[in-house]
Regions:
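Sec-dependent signal peptide recognition
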Residues: 1-9
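Short S/T/G/P-rich N-terminal loop/turn motif that feeds into the first structured element of a domain
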Residues: 18-235
Length: 235
């Protein structure tokens, strides 16, 4: 079931620098706040949050969920809690509504907070969390718009080839020295993700689009697989 569709709307000046790549794609609606943590027991932490929705209600989130790092973790228990909002205004207002460093003792005992950050989707993105490959990418501002355009083209090609895949590109705000552009490739299962990789390695026609997009990337900072899920939806 489609939970949320972030459709094309306004333009963020910081990521739509005019250049030889032509018209810049418009970002998607909505915004996210992410709290990066180290959980002592991710499953236990997630269950407690499912049972205690007060923090999500205080934030005013439309939808909230978690992503647990499954491969390439920087530390044991690497995960983050995300909250979806209708706008950057609402996302940034959430920082006044809830301080994760003052969480109830039951929650605080289950995780160590690393940092928090806000993200804006730079293309339409359907929120259907499951098997997710996340790349953190360093991309020159002058190439971001073209990269987003290539990811939109790639998503269309993958779906035409029979893959149920959502691709997201996200601009961080307030991420300190930790964050860069996020690229997410979301499939309904890990097996489905693996099938895409098999076809890529076999020289699928759509790989030419991927190659052109990677030519716009200065550096791949990290590459992980995560398992993501929704744990709260506003009533």
């Amino acid at each position: 079931m489609r939970l949320i569709a972030f459709l094309l709307t306004t333009v963020i000046a910081s990521v739509v620098v005019a250049d030889d790549h032509g018209s810049a794609p418009a970002p998607g609606d909505g915004a996210f706040v992410a709290l990066m943590v180290q959980a002592k027991d991710p499953d236990a932490y997630i269950e407690v949050m499912k049972e205690n929705t007060a923090p999500f209600e205080a934030l005013g989130s439309s939808v909230a969920g978690v992503c647990v790092t499954k491969t390439g973790a920087d530390y044991p228990g690497q995960m983050f809690v995300w909250n979806a909002f209708d706008s950057m205004e609402q996302a940034m207002a959430a920082t006044d509504a809830y301080d994760p460093m003052k969480a109830p003792a039951e929650l605080a005992a289950l995780r160590d907070v690393k940092y928090n950050v806000m993200f804006k989707p730079l293309k339409a993105f359907e929120l259907e969390p499951n098997s997710e490959r996340l790349w953190r990418l360093k991309i020159s501002p002058s190439n971001v718009a073209a990269f987003v355009g290539k990811m939109t083209e790639l998503e269309t090609a993958l779906r035409a080839a029979g893959h149920d895949m959502n691709i997201g590109v996200f601009q961080p705000f307030g991420g300190g020295t930790h964050e860069t552009i996020h690229l997410r490739a979301v499939s309904p299962t890990y097996a489905a993700s693996g099938k895409v990789i098999d076809e890529a390695l076999a020289g699928a026609e759509w790989m030419s689009i991927w190659g052109a997009a990677m030519g716009l990337v200065d550096e791949i900072i990290s590459d992980n697989f995560e398992h993501c899920q929704v744990i709260y939806t506003a009533s």
